[in-house]
């Protein structure tokens, strides 16, 4: 899920809730600030232009601020703001005037200026401060436990019953009736390839749908989620300032690693870095496994590995620390899980995380594992296995690009700069991955796309050509015929049309007898 898709999913959920609930949401400055952050860029611009303006603004004036190339973005921004009831239209003297929702305007203004926020951003407790390392390690343990469970890693302690229930309702995992064990679904495989903020919101959106059937107040739930994204990591916050619904939520948020408490009955809680990602655009943590690996990262030199090619001449050189220093890259600047992808489809992952390796094995044939690196090969079989599990070629390519080694990105940028020097009008995009690898992964997907499976019934062994022609023509007339072979007197019909053809056959063939 891209950053745009993530924000679209969240705003779409907010757009679908009743207007009365939306208006209650806008009473919280923290919530209004969070909603502002996930709106389209043009919508943010319009809001900033109106939030401190007491007068109505002609809609035509907003249209004039956008050039001809941005008309589609303009329409999307206005549509989103109207769906959220952020814009209040007023048609006077033939001109359509608009203004911001007054409740939203006041709350956002207070959030921006530090006005009357009414504990919207929590109540800070100055003492009982804990270290950031402790919070990082705690959130790492909680979140990776969920992801390890999904990929089937043996665990000493599995996630809580509520987390398992959420994974099942999200259709990321399914329970095997015969054994009671959980297994990952196609959606679950795709979930593992998303960035961590997308993963968090995938679970939280399902969490919101589940609590709609409970007695919990939806507005209080949303207030708490958006508030967590605005709190400061490392500071303690009073639980007494929370509503009854939000106190119940605290246990669930602990299970996800969003908040930390020294003891379950403590009167304070601490937000973690995971909570900040709910409303942040930061990409400092690029994926769930990468985020958690960063907690345990150590400064270490990367070894040099040489492999003879098939013809005995080609050599694969893994970047050494000296090479990286020359390129302006230090060891600590290289995120764990960084990948090097070569034109011969070999892949090197700088990681010793079992989770990172497990995710990589979803579409890579792993060959060897070293202290801080894994060697693998992208093969037709490994890609087809991933494709049949619901992962798309674009998702695999996006994952490889997102986790590309900084040296690969640097070389791609230098190559593009040289092309632009020769041809300033060159519109070729930045190619971080080898084009041969990207094209081949897409071709392997096309192989599977050529084959479409249908459920249905095969009719054959007809005694006469008349019987075959009668039934095949009837199946074709009612639109359920999927395939036929007149020479072999066989045809295949859809599952939905089988009962109709059988009834027709019984009536017509019985008359002939």
From Swiss-Prot:
Molecular function (Gene Ontology), one example? ATPase activator activity
Q: Does the keyword Secreted apply?
A: no
According to its UniProt entry, the protein's GO biological process terms are:
nucleotide-excision repair; transcription by RNA polymerase II; transcription initiation at RNA polymerase II promoter
Q: Does the keyword DNA damage apply?
A: yes
Annotated region Disordered: the residues are 296-319
Which UniProt keywords are listed?
Answer: DNA damage, DNA excision, DNA repair, Nucleus, Transcription, Transcription regulation
Example of a GO cellular component annotation carried by this entry:
transcription factor TFIIH core complex
Question: What protein family does this chain belong to?
Answer: Belongs to the TFB2 family.
Family annotation (PANTHER family): GENERAL TRANSCRIPTION FACTOR IIH SUBUNIT 4 (PTHR13152:SF0), TFIIH, POLYPEPTIDE 4 (PTHR13152)
The name under which this protein is listed is: General transcription and DNA repair factor IIH subunit TFB2
State the species of origin. Saccharomyces cerevisiae (strain ATCC 204508 / S288c) (Baker's yeast)
The taxonomy runs: Eukaryota, Fungi, Dikarya, Ascomycota, Saccharomycotina
